[in-house]
A protein has these predicted regions:
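Glycine-rich nucleotide phosphate-binding loop and flanking beta-alpha elements
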Residues: 25-26, 61-63, 212
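Short acidic, glycine/serine/threonine-rich loops at helix termini
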Residues: 30-31, 65-70, 116-118
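Short, conserved loop/helix-junction motifs that constitute active-site signature segments
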Residues: 45-51
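Early transmembrane alpha-helices of polytopic membrane proteins
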Residues: 110-112
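Class I SAM-dependent methyltransferase SAM-binding "motif I" and its flanking Rossmann-like core
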Residues: 64-98, 103, 107
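Iron-sulfur (Fe-S) cluster-binding modules
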Residues: 1-19, 92, 96-104, 117-279
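Extended, subdomain-level signal for the structured scaffold at the beginning of enzyme domains
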Residues: 1-44
Length: 279
């Protein structure tokens, strides 16, 4: 193994693509993982210098993720970003031999399509810097919001919100959903053999593809507010518009949505909701 790594690191063997999963260190602590006597970060730097492309797989490798949260006493970081700050292990100016910076494929976890699709497109030389967003994520996968195609969108549009989990309404206003902040195509692409997503399962989106996940999105299961207004507002609507539109939307909310939002079973117009017997 050491011989092969030396060949890659020294440029004696061609490296089409280096994919790294998991956070790395800015400076190696004594407990840092070593391979053949050298810190793993040293191998990553050397092989990245020889690689045509370098890919960070998952939020930890991309931005530091969970391993870099809080005070980050271990000094963990992503390959080319530390949260929103460019730099990371490989530095701001790093580029692979094909000319691209580190291509970030965040997610906790990253969707298999995002990983395989990115690797294939890079290997086929079909990715340019214009295809990457401001955090070097492929726009094809991260150019939308998880909110898009969420089955609860009708409730969201009229601000008909659930107050407890398992109710039918939107989870954004009260229950911590960050789908309007999460840049990903989760609700269009779907997970679990194309059957579901976090919000389709009644669970709030945590915006795990974001460079500031998880710290910036706590509390996870309730919505932080100031004077009744969520502190984190949707990315696709100007903040002043959102505040104004929200009030009008609630006033215009159909009774059907208002009722179903706090119901555990949809009650269709003209039909009475069955009594809640606790089952």
């Amino acid at each position: 193994m050491e011989h092969v790594l030396e060949e890659f690191a020294g440029g004696k063997m061609h490296v089409d693509l280096l994919a790294v999963e998991g956070a790395t260190y800015r400076a190696d602590p004594p407990s840092a993982m070593r391979v053949s006597g050298k810190p793993l970060t040293e191998w990553i730097r050397a092989i990245a210098d020889s690689a045509d492309y370098t890919v960070a797989v998952g939020t930890c490798a991309s931005f530091g993720g969970i391993m870099a949260c809080g005070r980050n006493p271990m000094g963990t970081t992503g390959l080319q970003y530390y949260r929103e700050e460019k730099g990371g292990l490989l530095g701001t100016d790093y580029r692979g031999r094909a000319g691209l910076p580190v291509v970030n494929v965040p997610g906790c976890p990253a969707h298999p399509d995002w990983i395989v699709g990115t690797l294939w497109a890079l290997r086929a030389n079909r990715v340019t810097e214009a295809d990457l967003d401001r955090f070097n994520r492929p726009r094809a996968f991260y150019g939308k919001l998880a909110h898009h195609a969420c089955p609860r969108n009708e409730y969201y549009e009229f601000k008909a919100s659930a107050t407890v989990y398992s109710q039918q309404g939107c989870l954004f206003e009260n229950l911590g959903c960050k789908g309007t902040l999460c840049e990903s195509d989760c609700n269009e692409r779907l997970w679990l053999a194309r059957t579901g997503s976090c919000t389709r399962g009644g669970f709030p989106c945590l915006s795990c593809t974001s460079p500031v996940f998880p710290d910036r999105f706590v509390p996870f299961f309730e919505t932080a507010k100031i004077s009744g207004i969520p502190t984190s507002l949707p990315l696709d609507v100007p903040k002043a518009w959102y505040v104004g539109i929200s009030g009008l939307s609630k006033l215009a909310c159909p009774e059907r949505l208002r009722r179903n939002a706090v119901s555990f079973k949809p009650a269709w117009s003209g039909k009475k909701e069955p009594p809640d017997d606790g089952h």
